[in-house]
Amino acid sequence: MLEGCILADSRQSKTAASPSPSRPQSSSNNSVPGAPNRVSFAKLREPLEVPGLLDVQTDSFEWLIGSPRWRESAAERGDVNPVGGLEEVLYELSPIEDFSGSMSLSFSDPRFDDVKAPVDECKDKDMTYAAPLFVTAEFINNNTGEIKSQTVFMGDFPMMTEKGTFIINGTERVVVSQLVRSPGVYFDETIDKSTDKTLHSVKVIPSRGAWLEFDVDKRDTVGVRIDRKRRQPVTVLLKALGWTSEQIVERFGFSEIMRSTLEKDNTVGTDEALLDIYRKLRPGEPPTKESAQTLLENLFFKEKRYDLARVGRYKVNKKLGLHVGEPITSSTLTEEDVVATIEYLVRLHEGQTTMTVPGGVEVPVETDDIDHFGNRRLRTVGELIQNQIRVGMSRMERVVRERMTTQDVEAITPQTLINIRPVVAAIKEFFGTSQLSQFMDQNNPLSGLTHKRRLSALGPGGLSRERAGLEVRDVHPSHYGRMCPIETPEGPNIGLIGSLSVYARVNPFGFIETPYRKVVDGVVSDEIVYLTADEEDRHVVAQANSPIDADGRFVEPRVLVRRKAGEVEYVPSSEVDYMDVSPRQMVSVATAMIPFLEHDDANRALMGANMQRQAVPLVRSEAPLVGTGMELRAAIDAGDVVVAEESGVIEEVSADYITVMHDNGTRRTYRMRKFARSNHGTCANQCPIVDAGDRVEAGQVIADGPCTDDGEMALGKNLLVAIMPWEGHNYEDAIILSNRLVEEDVLTSIHIEEHEIDARDTKLGAEEITRDIPNISDEVLADLDERGIVRIGAEVRDGDILVGKVTPKGETELTPEERLLRAIFGEKAREVRDTSLKVPHGESGKVIGIRVFSREDEDELPAGVNELVRVYVAQKRKISDGDKLAGRHGNKGVIGKILPVEDMPFLADGTPVDIILNTHGVPRRMNIGQILETHLGWCAHSGWKVDAAKGVPDWAARLPDELLEAQPNAIVSTPVFDGAQEAELQGLLSCTLPNRDGDVLVDADGKAMLFDGRSGEPFPYPVTVGYMYIMKLHHLVDDKIHARSTGPYSMITQQPLGGKAQFGGQRFGEMECWAMQAYGAAYTLQELLTIKSDDTVGRVKVYEAIVKGENIPEPGIPESFKVLLKELQSLCLNVEVLSSDGAAIELREGEDEDLERAAANLGINLSRNESASVEDLA
């Protein structure tokens, strides 16, 4: 029933491969059938395949809905009686009892029907991809024993698509996982500023409920704060819990500070202690023993008010050594928790290192690091939605209680008690407005994949970027293998938003685990163990590239390892507990796609990882010559390629679909997505890469999507690059490009814009979509069909009509003559105004699609809307000056000049280079990876052959056999931290194959003699030449360049608006005025501040003078000066404007006969204010 909403099984395997034999083998053979043969420089065999990259989303959602697949995996883990997220909420809520306790309502067994419409239809018709949710509701009348059971509809529940996204009102959204402080008990250490004493404190933080804080102050007394109220001696709380002074002395007699606290405590007995606490918590209310007892119980010991959650209970038990190994049943505090916490704090303050709890368990006594990943957990999508459902259900609970008391007992059924509106509203509110439900980043497949794996510390219950300090943003040793230390945004969110590491997974408590190979007595075994950050701290871990022999033993007697808090040292191999599974274990997917990452500075690697997400899909994608081996898995898991579900033979292929005859005799047709618009206006297009008659295996890629080539992620193009200055045109990161890339559409991308218009009912009548538009010539209407909608294939530019629409105008007073004519000729056609949909300013393209939704065709439309038309306009954007290009190493730049091919520097065989980058962009930025990529790119393009006749050279000793020879245009991979070495690169450069003339163009140092394309003379020095992977980023000059003639003005100041969206002007600010003053350009400055800005009268007169060819009149008084006067007058200051002779001047409000006349003659609207769109401007 739910198979359509969730992904297939995770591709994770727990069996390790055998250790590498003495002669290296290439690890290029991918587990994906039909994958391109990318030869790899990897020296290590990875024992664990990369897990499903979307599992963090899909597994969590499956837990929420309690899917069969989740139940199977829970059973494999050994969970007894697993409970899904929805079941958990219903279990917590049930039973809802009325105020007398005579009636109760219970919920159980949540289940879903099939989804209402497929994903494509939901996107098309602005629907939500959702399935109806039903629960079994049982009403019990305790007085009569009567039970009424019904299946109740609880609203449409948004479902997750196969790609790990949600479709809400037609738009694709992603719910980001949230990093929060785990509930539990946290001990802290601070230095008192006045006495330099070390003070200790502890916070017991619940998932829901009041905080409990204990501390030792500078006077050496132990205090407690309940619910952040005033501090009291801790013995008051113990007495309130029923402890006598003798019991306190018996348990805490070892501690001097506890004895002194007890002496300073003036309360006697439990009752007095309870009343003392009540006065602090409820000041002003009359205290009674019963109310004080009830308050304390409700605060910490009742499940309705206080919830540590399972994870909080687990953390408290682990920290304090309580109930170790027992199943977690309760999620409230216990008296033993409070006592053990106080004892732990006292021992910590006294400098003890261990503590034995009553059960006989010995636990270490130490402070907690709040930024450690053992203390921070993930709220994944399932838990976030569950919390929102819990909010909706608690709102519904109040309604149910009220209805129980007001309705007739005999007539009550579950259906009459339940109002599902609060639940539906809570879910809608979460998906529509929560900070963690985000508009999906769909620039390219990688940006979507990274968005789903994002970890955010922001959002409700998290941090705020203003208050977050450096410590919480910093890289922590416990991030290793869990959160990428490289990929995070630049700017105010740095360190608060991260990305999940490649191999990381989330355990049932929400802690991030990472896999390790178990080491037993110095032998690396095949067993894979997942560890949380807490567990890892207790072990010694070796890195993945520690040399091991064929038996799995460490080659070196001492092994480099890391211990707790990131300490690194050499230890004997027998002391090693675990070993990393892969060198790329610490980085995220985007970072793992940067070749030679190990040679890049971290700041530039961060930019490289982020800029890959901004690459736009090109007309023809091209896989990188130099990859990292991550491209295939990233493309498949991103979900934009089409993958064969079962093995079979291709029966039929067209641009729109592929039909596969499966081996079991069934037939399956896969539909292609053709020229669809992504969330960011890029083009999502799928193309088959198989032919009729081909054999395909299950899991094989059969069609490419955007930014993929042969099933691999392909974000840019392999371009021949020369790294050299050229006449200063590539100064300051500017880039020089060959015109070949423009002419041959190498870096051309397609962008699709969606334009929408609706016809509504207005007070004056219904709007109408029509071709009959007043005062519009036939040439303008040439591309509109009989309905008034533009035809598909029409070329349109700014101002052209896409959809004709007329809106009724208010009836005007008729003259006697008009009344006479109307009486003679009958009813005159109603007056209408043109409100057509036009192409916005600065846009153009070709119409590629039209969707019409009409109430007559029974389409679902918002209230008051009769017809809705969407027009899709595609624009082919060639690369041009001002566009931004980037490599994968943070090497970004803007195109400064496009040179004719014949002017570009060329190699000795006449091959012109495609792109020239400046040498200055490398040394101080320390991203040497781009140079190594350029060298290896040249080797891959030209091919190589290592002469092994006299034996394999030393530099090639560690290379796999298939890397001793490569054909031209071979695709290679150099995995991060396990890629090609510098010596190997130098050796390969000396072994490159000659061109067809027998010449080797690039020397062993990676440099070539280049010739000036203009003169034909050689440059005086050899230049680094090779192939670099270059991406075209989403920062396109067409979206940014803008010019204004006349446009909208601000209503108050009458100054032009700003920004391209408002068709605004350029801001001439304070500093620009200073520049004008410095040059003495008085008249230019006066013009800028008056007639070009907010002199409302003057600008109309100037316009008239220009039209008539007369001299420009004197400027008047700016409107902003009048606004300033009004503001001063509003402060009760009498401000007058005086002439040079001291006479008061009356400022006119623009009622000038000449002005009105000029405006009428020229057709200028003087009341031009802010406008919703540029088309509305007169």
UniProtKB/Swiss-Prot annotation:
EC number: 2.7.7.6
GO cellular component term of the entry, any: cytosol
Pfam families registered for this protein in UniProt: RNA_pol_Rpb2_1 (PF04563), RNA_pol_Rpb2_2 (PF04561), RNA_pol_Rpb2_3 (PF04565), RNA_pol_Rpb2_45 (PF10385), RNA_pol_Rpb2_6 (PF00562), RNA_pol_Rpb2_7 (PF04560)
Catalytic activity from the UniProt record: RNA(n) + a ribonucleoside 5'-triphosphate = RNA(n+1) + diphosphate
Consequence of substituting residue 456 to W: In strain: vr10; rifampicin-resistant
Biased composition (Low complexity): 18-33
Mutagenesis / variant outcome for changing residue 451 to L: In strain: SP28; rifampicin-resistant
Variant or mutagenesis effect after changing residue 437 to T: In strain: vr3; rifampicin-resistant
InterPro entries per UniProt: DNA-dir_RNA_pol_bsu_ext_1_sf, DNA-dir_RNA_pol_bsu_external_1, DNA-dir_RNA_pol_su2, DNA-dir_RNAP_su2_dom, DNA-dir_RNAP_su2_hyb_sf, RNA_pol_bsu_bac, RNA_pol_bsu_CS, RNA_pol_bsu_protrusion
Disordered: region residues: 1-37
Keyword Nucleotidyltransferase: yes
Mutagenesis or variant effect for residue 451 to P: In strain: vr8; rifampicin-resistant
Biological process according to GO: DNA-templated transcription; response to antibiotic
Outcome recorded upon mutating residue 451 to R: In strain: vr7; rifampicin-resistant
Effect of residue 451 to D: In strain: vr5; rifampicin-resistant
An annotated Gene Ontology molecular function: DNA-directed RNA polymerase activity
PANTHER family: DNA-DIRECTED RNA POLYMERASE I SUBUNIT 2 (PTHR20856)
Family statement: Belongs to the RNA polymerase beta chain family.
Function according to Swiss-Prot or TrEMBL: DNA-dependent RNA polymerase catalyzes the transcription of DNA into RNA using the four ribonucleoside triphosphates as substrates.
Record note on quaternary structure: The RNAP catalytic core consists of 2 alpha, 1 beta, 1 beta' and 1 omega subunit. When a sigma factor is associated with the core the holoenzyme is formed, which can initiate transcription. Interacts with CarD, TRCF (Mfd) and RbpA.
NCBIfam families: PRK00405.1, rpoB
Protein's UniProt name: DNA-directed RNA polymerase subunit beta
Gene: rpoB
